[in-house]
């Protein structure tokens, strides 16, 4: 909602500037577009609980968003003070009562030193209310000026965040941070990074259709990526004033849960869009995020990729295929266990699917398969497919 402009991170339009500890939001008029309200967050919690999703990420919960971007201010956020319409205790209690957790969000506005000053208090607050993961953000030019997102100062900063979070038993999903280089092997609480153009760029003109079949060969070689997939209503103009569109088909979005490896995955569309395409959403309900094995079945950089992954601690497999140009994927099920049968659900592009002309055309095929079977699957231009293979 915020990315396309139907909601805002900010609470009010009354403030041209914000001063930490001085600005009194209780005297401000709400703007009516603030996204992180008690009512809206509870709606998302209910949806997550109903569909087996573990956490709800809430952005724009804390004071300071009226003055966060473009001014290169050091002291905008303290990361502990919620807006008047966000009851942090009530919402966490409500989420826990539903078997769901809230995920914390710390947008730093690239004021790294300010974040470090407040980090202990911010993580203590998370421990107090039961948060176990934080999405950090570094939008805008780095403060102090003259530093860059990839500079030594910032690499040292990202490392301090990871290590401090680990002491608090907190997982980190860093956005706009430096490209990881395997550090998650040493610090496994780094469960995700953006560090490349993710789905949010689809609202700003879009990523080319080959983008998602290039990243597995480049960005993802250094560690997991939070690509924020799962957009079903790909024509943004159909539900907002944004004229951009997502450069994949609906099934192409499903494939990203396998192609874009991350032990932390987002379902980035609106609940009402998932309810509209509930049969396709079943794959997101089913797909795992942690794996015992991965096999790359076919791949060509910037052209196509097909990967199969075995869900951790189970005999279940999931397969995702993504393409730039239209093609027929050939999936050989040689990786399945001999002697077992699998309930196979194939989510594939429809015959007339195309990421620009007909992105929501899809079909779901159910069958029983075994080791050695071969599946031939249609992939549309900018499309893809997803398969669940559940051991019987």
Question: What is each of the regions a protein language model found here?
Answer:
Residues 251-298:
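Catalytic cores of secreted or luminal carbohydrate-active enzymes
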Residues 365-392:
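C-terminal beta-strand-rich structural cap/linker in extracellular carbohydrate-active enzymes
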Residues 1-98, 106, 384:
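Conserved structural scaffold segments of CAZyme catalytic domains across common CAZy folds
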Residues 59-245, 249:
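Aromatic- and carboxylate-enriched substrate-binding clefts and catalytic-loop regions
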Residues 21, 58-59, 103-107, 134-139, ...:
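Generic beta-strand/beta-sheet core signal
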Residues 300-343, 385-386:
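Carbohydrate-binding surface patches
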């Amino acid at each position: 909602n915020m990315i396309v402009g139907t909601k805002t991170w900010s609470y009010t339009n009354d403030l041209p500037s914000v001063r930490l500890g001085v600005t009194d939001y209780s005297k401000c008029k709400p703007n009516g577009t603030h996204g992180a309200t008690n009512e809206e967050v509870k709606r998302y919690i209910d949806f997550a609980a109903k569909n087996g999703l573990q956490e709800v990420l809430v952005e724009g919960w804390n004071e300071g968003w009226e003055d966060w971007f473009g001014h290169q201010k050091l002291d905008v956020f303290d990361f502990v003070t919620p807006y008047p319409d966000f009851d942090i205790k009530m919402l966490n209690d409500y989420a826990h009562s539903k078997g769901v957790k809230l995920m914390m969000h710390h947008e730093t506005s690239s004021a790294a030193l300010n974040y470090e000053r407040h980090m202990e208090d911010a993580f203590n607050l998370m421990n107090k209310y039961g948060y176990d993961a934080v999405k950090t953000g570094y939008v805008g030019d780095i403060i102090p000026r003259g530093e860059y997102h990839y500079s030594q100062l910032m690499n040292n900063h990202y490392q301090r965040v990871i290590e401090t979070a680990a002491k608090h038993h907190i997982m980190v999903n860093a956005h706009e941070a430096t490209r990881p280089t395997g550090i998650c092997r040493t610090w496994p609480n780094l469960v995700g990074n953006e560090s490349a153009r993710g789905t949010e760029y689809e609202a700003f003109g879009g990523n080319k259709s080959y983008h998602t079949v290039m990243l597995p060969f480049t960005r993802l070689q250094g560690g997991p990526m939070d690509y924020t997939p799962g957009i079903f209503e790909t024509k943004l103009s159909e539900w907002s004033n944004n004229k951009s569109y997502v450069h994949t088909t609906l099934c192409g979005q499903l494939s990203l849960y396998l192609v874009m490896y991350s032990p932390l995955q987002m379902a980035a569309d609106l609940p009402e869009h998932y309810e509209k395409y509930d049969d396709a959403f079943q794959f997101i309900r089913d797909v795992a995020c942690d794996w015992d094995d991965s096999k790359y079945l076919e791949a060509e950089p910037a052209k196509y990729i097909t990967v199969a992954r075995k869900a951790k601690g189970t005999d279940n497999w999931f397969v995702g295929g993504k393409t730039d140009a239209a093609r027929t994927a050939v999936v050989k099920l040689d990786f399945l266990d001999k002697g077992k049968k699998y309930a196979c659900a194939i989510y594939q592009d429809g015959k007339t699917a195309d990421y620009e002309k007909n992105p929501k055309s899809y079909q779901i095929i159910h069958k029983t398969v075994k080791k050695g079977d071969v599946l031939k699957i249609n992939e549309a231009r900018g499309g893809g497919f997803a398969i669940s293979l559940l051991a019987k």
